[in-house]
Design a protein with these regions (language model features):
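Flexible helical/loop "lid" subdomain adjacent to adenine-nucleotide binding pockets
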Residues: 122-269, 277
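AMP-forming adenylation/ATP pyrophosphatase catalytic core
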Residues: 2-42, 58-64, 93-95, 108, ...
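Enrichment for repetitive, rod-forming helical segments
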Residues: 113-116, 197, 219, 301
């Protein structure tokens, strides 16, 4: 299961933090970065390791106002930032009413964060997301989510690592009670499905899921590169290439054209567009009121009526 490396306990706290930071692809020392910090162990560790890596970090806490005590969570982040010598600011947002609270809160949060914000996603988060996307019937990109890199520097670490960082620094992370609520599908994946998979496999499956995501990311990158040379509006060209490449070319065209607006361009939508390209139908609705129509062998993208 997920256990810290016993050998690291022989290191001093400073060396242990440095060793963990060295495993993370943070930007170069001296780079100014913004870290999204909720007050949980992962985001507090993100801030601490960014400072350890030499970044000039500012912690941004987003208060969604969804539960009592959110002001206290901001205080936890502010205190950690002071201890580390990082900047701090808190932003309050209003989460719109509607279904899928988790998605709406995420959308409200990212609307006020800079596009290059660093997040504290770990290998455990990535494994959960692979399984969640698989259950939604995702395509290849969804099976390779949360790619590691400077914006997600902790993807190579485990939750036990982020908890260890907090222990070393004396942080008491915020415990979000909603993380135990089985009404949220991610919680069931985290607390039920992954432990069951580990029991059946007789080993920790998080590294296996991450390894598969890495391999599929390489395939996805290649497909996107090949699809980039295709004219997705040409029905003849789409018919002449492997269907896997055609699917990627169509989806990239739709997304780059602005289709989505909070909706997912799923595999079924791509297949409907392929049917239009093949001549099985003249036009189809994609998602959110967007349509694709065929005329004289070419596909055209039509925005919702209110955007024309």
């Amino acid at each position: 299961m997920d256990h810290p490396d016993p050998s690291r306990r022989r290191l001093t706290p400073g060396l242990e933090l440095a060793a963990l930071a060295a495993r993370c692809p943070f930007p170069a020392s001296g780079t100014a970065v913004t870290c999204a910090v909720s007050g949980g162990a992962d985001s507090l560790a993100l801030l601490a390791l960014a400072i350890t890596a030499g970044c000039v970090a500012t912690a941004v806490h987003v208060d969604h106002g969804l539960r009592p005590g959110s002001d206290d969570e901001a205080d936890v982040v502010a205190a950690a930032a002071r201890q580390l010598g990082a900047g701090f600011r808190s932003v309050a947002v209003t989460v719109p009413v509607g279904p899928n609270l988790e998605a709406r809160a995420r959308q409200a949060r990212y609307a006020v964060l800079p596009p290059d914000v660093l997040t504290g996603h770990t290998a455990d988060d990535r494994a959960e997301t692979v399984l969640l996307n698989m259950m939604r019937g995702t395509g290849l990109d969804g099976l390779a989510p949360l790619a590691p890199g400077p914006r997600r520097p902790l993807v190579g670490l485990r939750r036990s690592d982020t908890e260890r960082v907090c222990d070393l620094l004396g942080f008491e992370p915020v415990q979000d009670p909603s993380n135990l609520d089985p009404v949220h599908r991610r919680n069931r994946v985290r607390n039920e499905l992954l432990p069951l998979a580990a029991d059946v496999a007789g080993r920790d499956v998080v590294p296996l899921l991450n390894r598969q995501a890495d391999l599929l990311a390489e395939v996805a990158d290649w497909l996107h590169e090949v699809a980039g040379a295709v004219d997705p509006t040409s029905a003849r060209e789409l018919a002449a290439i492997p269907v896997a490449v055609a699917r990627v070319a169509i989806r990239d065209w739709l997304v780059q054209g602005g289709v989505g607006g909070g909706y997912v361009v799923d595999a079924a939508a791509v297949e409907r567009v392929l049917d239009v390209a093949r001549g099985s139908s003249v036009a189809t609705e994609v998602v959110g009121g967007w349509r694709v129509a065929r005329s004289r062998g070419r596909l055209g993208l039509q925005p919702p009526s209110g955007q024309r």
